[in-house]
Amino acid sequence: MNLIAAAIAIGLSALGAGIGNGLIVSRTVEGVARQPEARGQLMSIMFIGIGLVEALPILGLVISFIVLFQ
């Protein structure tokens, strides 16, 4: 049962991060297409957002390790 819970925790967090990263990158590409002069500012904001979104799978991994080795 712990193995299933750990797999669900890491799977759902990876799924959420994948969807979030896709949305962030697509909106950034749309913004650059509309305003090419704002490319640098949009890219830095995008990288900060991706870093925050990638914290979710790391937390999912930690939670799955806690559940797995409990």
Curated annotation (Swiss-Prot):
Chief place where the protein resides: membrane
**Presence of the UniProt keyword Transcription in the record:** no
The record describes its membrane topology as:
Multi-pass membrane protein
Positions of the record's site feature: Reversibly protonated during proton transport: E54
Q: Name one Pfam family in it.
A: ATP-synt_C
Sequence intervals crossing the membrane? 4-24, 47-67
Q: Which InterPro entries match?
A: ATP_synth_csu_bac/chlpt, ATP_synth_F0_csu, ATP_synth_F0_csu_DDCD_BS, ATP_synth_F0_csu_sf, ATPase_proteolipid_c-like_dom, F/V-ATP_Csub_sf
Q: Which PANTHER family match?
A: ATP SYNTHASE LIPID-BINDING PROTEIN, MITOCHONDRIAL (PTHR10031), ATPASE PROTEIN 9 (PTHR10031:SF0)
Subunit composition?
Answer: F-type ATPases have 2 components, F(1) - the catalytic core - and F(0) - the membrane proton channel. F(1) has five subunits: alpha(3), beta(3), gamma(1), delta(1), epsilon(1). F(0) has three main subunits: a(1), b(2) and c(10-14). The alpha and beta chains form an alternating ring which encloses part of the gamma chain. F(1) is attached to F(0) by a central stalk formed by the gamma and epsilon chains, while a peripheral stalk is formed by the delta and b chains.
- Family, per the entry? Belongs to the ATPase C chain family.
The role this protein plays is: F(1)F(0) ATP synthase produces ATP from ADP in the presence of a proton or sodium gradient. F-type ATPases consist of two structural domains, F(1) containing the extramembraneous catalytic core and F(0) containing the membrane proton channel, linked together by a central stalk and a peripheral stalk. During catalysis, ATP synthesis in the catalytic domain of F(1) is coupled via a rotary mechanism of the central stalk subunits to proton translocation.
The identity of this protein, by name, is ATP synthase subunit c
Q: Organism, per UniProt?
A: Staphylococcus carnosus (strain TM300)
Q: What is the lineage of its organism?
A: Bacteria, Bacillati, Bacillota, Bacilli, Bacillales
Q: Source gene?
A: atpE
